[in-house]
């Protein structure tokens, strides 16, 4: 599916006004070959621990988007080249991460969309802490499981339902 978030905002100004379509703050950068991605949100809330990220990406993605509230930590990465390849193999459409990625050159080779704050060479811990399928606070919007995410180079949108 090809789209532009700018066009979606223009076409759905009524939903923007109602709050059923929300724009995340412009702090996310794309780190993959994919120019745009969208899908139903699966949410995680973790902090500097990516064990739950891996466990989730090991499941069939079925075109969904993994939305991770990593607390905005810039101290370590929660997604790198191996997890991006795993996401691609299992059919995930994308990842939106309020935190860091690493292995940026490897991420540029995958077709799974990845939007994150920045990079960090340090890996996250693997303690297995965190929560799944909860509402998460990302810069600019609350994201609930089952909502829809649309992302491209211009930004990341969250919609209460799939957009036409």
UniProtKB/Swiss-Prot annotation:
Cofactor list: a divalent metal cation
GO process annotations (BP): regulation of RNA metabolic process
Q: What is an example of a Pfam family matching this protein?
A: RraA-like
Spell out the CDD domains in the cross-references: RraA_family
Known catalysed reaction(s)? 4-hydroxy-4-methyl-2-oxoglutarate = 2 pyruvate; oxaloacetate + H(+) = pyruvate + CO2
Q: Which GO terms describe its molecular function?
A: 4-hydroxy-4-methyl-2-oxoglutarate aldolase activity; metal ion binding; oxaloacetate decarboxylase activity; ribonuclease inhibitor activity
Top enzyme class of this protein?
Answer: lyase
Does the UniProt entry include the keyword Lyase? yes
Q: Which UniProt keywords apply?
A: Lyase, Metal-binding
Q: Which NCBIfam families match?
A: NOT-MenG (TIGR01935), PRK09372.1 (NF006875)
For this protein, the record's PANTHER family field holds: 4-HYDROXY-4-METHYL-2-OXOGLUTARATE ALDOLASE 3-RELATED
Assigned protein family: Belongs to the class II aldolase/RraA-like family.
Q: What does this protein do?
A: Catalyzes the aldol cleavage of 4-hydroxy-4-methyl-2-oxoglutarate (HMG) into 2 molecules of pyruvate. Also contains a secondary oxaloacetate (OAA) decarboxylase activity due to the common pyruvate enolate transition state formed following C-C bond cleavage in the retro-aldol and decarboxylation reactions.
- What's the name of the protein? Putative 4-hydroxy-4-methyl-2-oxoglutarate aldolase
Q: From which organism does this entry originate?
A: Paraburkholderia phytofirmans (strain DSM 17436 / LMG 22146 / PsJN)
Instruction: Specify the taxonomic lineage.
Output: Bacteria, Pseudomonadati, Pseudomonadota, Betaproteobacteria, Burkholderiales
């Amino acid at each position: 599916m090809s789209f532009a978030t700018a066009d979606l905002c223009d076409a759905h100004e009524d939903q923007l006004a109602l709050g059923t379509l929300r724009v995340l703050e412009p702090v996310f950068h794309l780190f993959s070959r994919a120019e745009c991605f969208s899908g139903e949100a699966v949410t995680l809330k973790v902090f500097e621990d990516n064990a739950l990220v891996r466990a989730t990406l090991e499941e069939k993605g079925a075109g969904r988007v993994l939305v991770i509230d990593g607390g905005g930590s810039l101290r370590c990465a929660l997604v790198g080249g191996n997890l991006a390849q795993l996401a691609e193999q299992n059919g995930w459409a994308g990842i939106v991460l309020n935190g860091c990625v690493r292995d940026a050159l490897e991420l540029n080779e995958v077709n799974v969309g990845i939007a994150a704050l920045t990079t960090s060479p340090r890996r996250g811990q693997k303690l297995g802490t965190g929560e799944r399928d909860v509402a998460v606070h990302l810069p600019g919007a609350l994201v609930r499981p089952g909502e829809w995410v649309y992302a491209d180079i211009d930004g990341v949108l969250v919609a209460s339902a799939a957009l036409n």
